[in-house]
């Protein structure tokens, strides 16, 4: 199913779920997964200061450098191999700008519904540990369930990356029985639970506590698991 979004000289954005001017009643959320935006920002451009509240916001850098500034006083640059996690809670403002004047920045921004209203706002930037190929690699976990190189959110939600070799099959297991998973392919092609997915394709999977993911080519994917609402 085609994604929503917009294309211009400053920004190319693709929305998996309803966002901004894109609305599809069939694609509002998957469990607590509310937004999955795939953004490419031109050199020197970006998103000026804007507000958020009561949302867990995860940013994953794919290429280039993303400069972040917020009302809590954080000024950081996010690069590939790092993730950024914000709890908007009672309210924050922030900006996201391409830190380069010559190269575009590409990143995923993912919003997760919070487990409770009005948490204290916070910002965390994490350098990810090296990932083994053909093994799901946790990058975000619920509070207290991760580690030094894992971000955390106020929600029973998990994020993994998976670097998969061609023809390799990995059994993907839910963290908790009854959870669902959303698989989003960054590069290459996979077969997930019997369905073929190409670059930037995504699919929600429910009703199974585990399912196979096969590399149709060498591939890179990100997955999300949470109780399906």
Task: Mark where each language-model region is.
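Hydrophobic alpha-helical segments and helix pairs
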Residues: 57-97, 104
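Hydrophobic secondary-structure block in the mid-to-C-terminal portion of proteins
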Residues: 148-204
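Glycine- and acidic-residue-biased ligand/ion/polar-headgroup-sensing regions
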Residues: 55-69, 82, 175-193
């Amino acid at each position: 199913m085609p994604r929503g979004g917009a294309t211009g000289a400053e920004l190319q954005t693709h929305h998996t779920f309803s966002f901004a001017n894109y609305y599809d009643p069939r694609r509002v959320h998957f469990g607590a997964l509310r937004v999955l935006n795939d953004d490419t920002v031109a050199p020197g451009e970006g998103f000026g200061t804007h507000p958020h509240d009561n949302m867990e916001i995860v940013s994953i850098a794919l290429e280039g450098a993303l400069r972040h500034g917020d009302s809590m006083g954080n000024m950081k640059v996010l690069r590939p191999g790092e993730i950024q996690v914000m709890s908007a809670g009672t309210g924050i403002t922030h900006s996201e700008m391409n830190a380069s004047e010559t190269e575009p920045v590409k990143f995923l921004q993912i919003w997760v519904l919070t487990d409770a209203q009005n948490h204290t706002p916070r910002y965390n930037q994490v350098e990810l540990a090296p990932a083994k190929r053909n093994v799901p690699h946790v990058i975000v976990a619920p509070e207290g369930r991760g580690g030094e190189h894992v971000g955390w959110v106020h929600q029973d939600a998990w994020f993994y990356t998976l670097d998969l070799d061609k023809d390799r099959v990995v059994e993907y297991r839910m963290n908790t029985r009854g959870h669902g998973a959303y698989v989003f392919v960054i590069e290459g092609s996979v077969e997930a639970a019997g369905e073929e997915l190409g670059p930037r394709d995504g699919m929600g999977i429910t009703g199974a506590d585990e399912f196979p993911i096969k590399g149709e080519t060498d591939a890179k994917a990100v997955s999300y698991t949470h109780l399906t609402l």
